[in-house]
Amino acid sequence: ADYLLIMDSDGQCDPRQIFKFWNARKKADLVVGYRIKRRDFLYRKFFSDFAKLVYSFFFKVKLKDPSFAFSLIRKDVYKSLQNFTPSMPEGFFWEYNARAIYKGYKILEIGINHKKRKYGDTQIFQVWRLPKIALINFIGLLRVKFDLLTK
């Protein structure tokens, strides 16, 4: 296959919207989704908005939703970006998108409908874990920034 499709399996993404990514694939190296009318708890939205502010300060990346796991990536782009040890375990896509932009890849954003979670509960972003996750990801942002500056 020439492309890799990444999509969460919690029912918040509508697989019928994959065609939007497929139709846009020739316009960019990575096609990434952003949530229209995000259907998450308020604390998740707040945490994400704050993280996006910090992220855009560090990387000067202008993505609407850099953490969203609904993407279509060309195989050669994926292979060129897979050789790094993630610095942000709960923020993989934040890091992946920053590395793609720093390598000069073009990213196209596609708005997608976002639904309430159908299956399971979040294991990562539980309220009691947010301070620890914020600290780990902040340190991860520093590591990624340093790594990108030294290459």
Name the predicted role of every residue range.
Residues 1-12:
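Short beta-strand-to-loop acidic/aromatic patch adjacent to the donor-nucleotide binding site
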Residues 88, 97-115:
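Catalytic donor-sugar/metal-binding loop of nucleotide-sugar-dependent glycosyltransferases
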Residues 10, 54, 74, 100, ...:
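Residue-level signature of catalytic and energy-coupling elements of molecular machines
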Residues 94:
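DNA-recognition element of transcription regulators
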Residues 9-11, 35, 112:
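Active-site loop/turn elements of alpha/beta-hydrolase fold enzymes
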Residues 136-151:
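C-terminal, non-catalytic tails of nucleotide-sugar-dependent glycosyltransferases
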Residues 3, 15-90, 117-138:
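Acceptor/aglycone-binding surface of glycosyltransferases and processive sugar-polymer synthases
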